[in-house]
């Protein structure tokens, strides 16, 4: 019964293959966990902005106009004035040539329509573009190299500490169970001694048996002894 208990205690010791397998699985699990947490933290911390694509489908996106509304109005007014001066020059040249239009108002209206949209329409269009360009959508930026290195360093430190703790734990458990091994050796020695004693006892009995056989050759009764035999 004692030998059976020793055998069970020895069987409970951890195999090196089992220890390495458990350590590798734990390290992989911790690495995946740290990597996923680092990616989520980077995505939450580094939030950027992105401009909406333009209505024409260009890849560059909608761009804001440079300058203020007053500058745009002044430039438009200057353009309109220049157009009017050009129209007046055309009318003056036609009048000089002798071909005068009897309805100059209608001619000017036709030229203004051909020239483009009015100033109010341009201002409204510019305001609409400003509203479109001011709309911004959050977008996760790619983490920088320094951030990636920092997260990799943190993951390596966590993995190293985990492996060291596992190794120390299993070594401590193995060290606690190692003093019980001499008791098993002593039991084996006792069994060997008992077997040796049994063999010696068997040899002794055999010797006694041989001695008895030698003693049986001598005459047991003196009456049967023949004097002439000696």
Curated annotation (Swiss-Prot):
Residues 86-100 have a biased composition (Acidic residues). Changing residue 230 to F: In strain: Beverley, MAS and Me49. Changing residue 198 to R: In strain: M7741, NED and TONT. Changing residue 227 to A: In strain: RUB. Residues 51-77 have a biased composition (Polar residues). It comes from the Eukaryota. It is found in: Secreted; Parasitophorous vacuole lumen; Parasitophorous vacuole membrane; Cytoplasmic vesicle, Secretory vesicle. Keywords: Cytoplasmic vesicle, Glycoprotein, Membrane, Secreted, Transmembrane, Transmembrane helix. Residues 110-128, 214-230 have a biased composition (Basic and acidic residues). Residues 46-150, 175-230 are annotated as: Disordered. Glycans are attached at residue 74. Residues 184-210 have a biased composition (Gly residues). Changing residue 58 to L: In strain: RUB. GO terms for cellular component: membrane; symbiont-containing vacuole membrane; transport vesicle. Changing residue 50 to R: In strain: Beverley and Me49. The chain crosses the membrane at residues 14-34, 151-171. It holds the Pfam family GRA6. Disulfide bonds: none annotated. The keyword Ribosomal protein does not apply. Belongs to the Gra6 family. Major granular component involved in excreted-secreted antigen (ESA) immunity. May have a structural role in the membranous network of the parasitophorous vacuole (PV). This is Dense granule protein 6. It comes from Toxoplasma gondii. The gene is GRA6.
